[in-house]
Amino acid sequence: MGIKKYNPTTNGRRNMTTNDFAEITTDRPEKSLLAPLSKKAGRNNQGKITVRHQGGGHKRQYRIIDFKRNKDGIPGRVATIEYDPNRSANIALINYVDGEKRYILAPKTLEVGMEVMSGPESDIKIGNALPLINIPVGTVVHNIELKPGRGGQLVRSAGTSAQVLGKEGKYVLVRLTSGEVRLVLSACRASIGQVGNEQHELIKIGKAGRSRWLGKRPTVRGSVMNPVDHPHGGGEGRSPIGRKSPMSPWGKPTLGFKTRKKNKASDKFIVRRRKK
């Protein structure tokens, strides 16, 4: 992908950049792989806000993605590379020889016409999916399962990748994008290659309205709220927060306060913590 810049014809355009969508081959998604997606606006089933700063935005349809990659031994060919409004990565439509169609995350350098396969006997080739035990040490992977058969949960965002570092018994050592080194069951599957659309992080939104198109609402500082709304609120003019440390809206310490639970079950699988 490339980054498209604009002439400063307005203040909104001055610092705005967009994806040039050079890799996208169609703007019409596969209808059989679409599902309705209703707006939640950050509310739970009681109508209470559980996730702040969400709401509005353009209407979307969900693309059903094959994260499990469990169609073993059946070759498929890449039909299209498509934009997905629900994630930062692009997706690829795969036409299998038995007639089935599935979407997968599009890895870097995957192109229309290339063949992909799943299963233990697959080649170490971009877009193929194999159990970690069958992937050589040093290989770059993405879409990693945490439990066999559950589907990929790790390394799915645009431009991310992990690396297989070694094999220890029934586990495989994997270094994640964050720098964390983690043990993953060797029966778990991963896809070969780095997730595409790697320049996504370089895009500048440019104006508030574009954030609203994406369904992002404004983030308001606690110090400009009333005391009823935030621990930092109240006072005359620009007042200090009056606390020993900054607080979240719910009165919990924040900005550096560790929130990970002690004795978490997955701690035993983390060999080295992520970089701070």
UniProtKB/Swiss-Prot annotation:
Signal sequence coordinates: none
GO annotation (BP), single: cytoplasmic translation
GO annotation, cellular component aspect: large ribosomal subunit
InterPro entries hit by this protein: NA-bd_OB-fold, Rib_uL2_dom2, Ribosomal_uL2, Ribosomal_uL2_bac/org-type, Ribosomal_uL2_C, Ribosomal_uL2_CS, Ribosomal_uL2_dom3, Ribosomal_uL2_RNA-bd_dom
Keyword entries, A-Z: Ribonucleoprotein, Ribosomal protein, RNA-binding, rRNA-binding
Region Disordered, annotated ranges: 1-20, 219-276
Subunit-level organization: Part of the 50S ribosomal subunit. Forms a bridge to the 30S subunit in the 70S ribosome.
Family that this chain belongs to: Belongs to the universal ribosomal protein uL2 family.
Protein's job: One of the primary rRNA binding proteins. Required for association of the 30S and 50S subunits to form the 70S ribosome, for tRNA binding and peptide bond formation. It has been suggested to have peptidyltransferase activity; this is somewhat controversial. Makes several contacts with the 16S rRNA in the 70S ribosome.
Listed name of the protein: Large ribosomal subunit protein uL2
UniProt source species: Bacillus mycoides (strain KBAB4) (Bacillus weihenstephanensis)
